[in-house]
Structures are given as structure tokens and as C-alpha cells.
A protein has these predicted regions:
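A cross-kingdom C-terminal cell-surface attachment/processing module
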Residues: 163-176
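Solvent-exposed, non-transmembrane regions of membrane-associated and secreted proteins
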Residues: 1-158, 173-179
Length: 183
């Protein structure tokens, strides 16, 4: 599984980024490394930005340099720290290649939220060796400005709570009406 405390998620990991696997959790992309804690490796983990009410990587923009990501493989728990963040085009596979001498995990999801894949939000994590990482700005393609998905996510939460409130109100009214008719 993968655990990201800053995002409040713990997701099962599946091998292969198929639609079925990504509906169930996060997926290790094909032709990338497995999370075994070895140098010259990059395990690219993809997840939806949110799917059927389950957050998956919805809150990925909360991650900053130095934040912790934990991977539990069948043999051990591996700890990684966020090193840098980029926004890339979906077909820019050069951005997720193995980097010499590094043990990496790269998180990948669509950006902006609910965009259906216009861009990719990429979080590069390196094996935690106890070093402190400097804060970095999010790097983007050709200095293109990308709006944060924070407000879109907040709006979605408000709509959900408002809908719940309306349902509760009408449910209470229905109970009151049925009691008046019955009693």
C-alpha cells in the first residue's frame, strides 16, 4: 500500500495502471520500477484525482518538499520524501524516467482537478535518508500559469454538505408530516 499522511490517504497498490486497478486504488505504471528500495529505480504510481467519492490523489496539491510518503511492499516499509513537483503534458514520458543513483517514487495524477487529463501533476519523491530538503516552487512547462485546484475541491465539498443538509431537512419534514397524519 501507499500512505501519504499529509493527504490523509492509505491506498492499496496494484500492478499496472488499468482502469480496473485505478478504480480500486493506486497503480504502479507499467515499464517503471517496483518499490523495492534499490538505487537506479523510479516507481511511478498513478491514481485518480478522486473517483466516486473516494479522494485517492485529490489533495495532492497539499504536498510540499520534505513531506513523507510511505510504501509498504511485501517485505518492508519504505519511506520517501517529496523532493520536487512539476506539471507536465500527458505525453511527456521523459519526465518520469529513472534518475541515475536515485531510489525514487513518483506520484502522478491529472491536473487540474476534474480536467479529464489535460495535464499531469507530478510529485517526485526520493528515499528518505534523514536529510532536510529545501522548499521548492512548483515547476511548470514554459512558465505557464496553472490555477490551483484547491477552490474547485472546496466547492465540491460545499455542494456535498449542502445536498446532505437538504436531504436531512426534507427527511425531517416528511417525518413530521407523517406523524401529524397518523396521530
Amino acid at each position: 500500500y501507499i500512505r501519504i499522511k499529509k493527504m490523509h490517504v492509505k491506498l492499496p497498490l496494484y500492478l499496472g495502471a488499468t482502469l480496473e486497478n485505478m478504480r480500486k486504488g493506486a497503480a504502479i505504471m507499467g515499464e517503471t520500477s517496483l518499490p523495492l528500495g534499490t538505487k537506479n529505480s523510479n516507481c511511478v504510481i498513478a491514481a485518480h484525482r478522486g473517483y466516486q467519492g473516494i479522494p485517492y490523489f485529490r489533495e495532492i496539491e497539499k504536498l510540499k518538499a520534505g513531506d513523507k510518503v510511505t510504501i509498504q511492499n511485501p517485505w518492508e516499509k519504505l519511506s520517501y520524501r517529496v523532493e520536487k513537483i512539476k506539471i507536465i503534458k500527458p505525453d511527456d514520458s521523459d519526465q518520469i524516467r529513472i534518475q541515475k543513483e536515485k531510489d525514487m517514487v513518483t506520484l502522478l495524477t491529472c491536473h487540474p482537478y476534474r480536467s479529464h487529463g489535460k495535464f499531469r501533476y507530478v510529485v517526485y519523491c526520493i528515499r528518505d535518508q534523514g536529510q532536510k530538503l529545501p522548499a521548492q516552487k512548483i515547476r511548470t512547462m514554459n512558465d505557464t500559469y496553472f490555477e490551483s485546484s484547491k477552490w474547485d475541491i472546496q466547492r465540491e465539498k460545499i455542494v456535498r454538505y449542502a445536498g446532505l443538509g437538504i436531504l436531512l431537512f426534507f427527511g425531517m419534514e416528511l417525518i413530521k408530516t407523517s406523524k401529524r397524519k397518523g396521530g
